[in-house]
Amino acid sequence: KLLRWYGIDRNSPRKDFRCEENIEEYGYKFHMNDIAAVIGIEQLKYVNDLVSKHINNAKFYDDQLKNLSKITLLPRSDEAISASWLYTIHVDGRDEFMNYMSKNNVMTSKVHERNDIHDCFSEFRSKVPGVDSFCSSQVSIPVGWWLTSDQLNYIVNLIKEF
């Protein structure tokens, strides 16, 4: 069997996109072809507008989600501009939050976990309590260019009600 998509079996059921399954053998992500390259080149015409929408959506969240008791926003540097591909927050009761958002038709994801928790990287397991602490409460919420103002407000209101 060919290993694809970093070694993740995409056919096995899971709650979160890529954070629950043990990866026994690492794989690679080599699926760019000429057609994908042409589509990517064509999309460059729109990249500034799309990234601006991500950034503006993140700023909206920054403003609306600050000072909530169960939510901690990630610090932002004044010296850097994030493209806001993800909008990650820390949530007290993260797993309950993810279930709550799912029941209200909003997808959330942990997106990433420590690599050394998987068998294929077991020889590199280390004690990193700061990373463990970060991973225990972090979750990403939708921030993409495709979100409407109504959808952003819906997400914010759900979070405030949690």
Q: Language-model segments: which ranges?
A:
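PLP-dependent aminotransferase class I/II
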Residues: 1-162
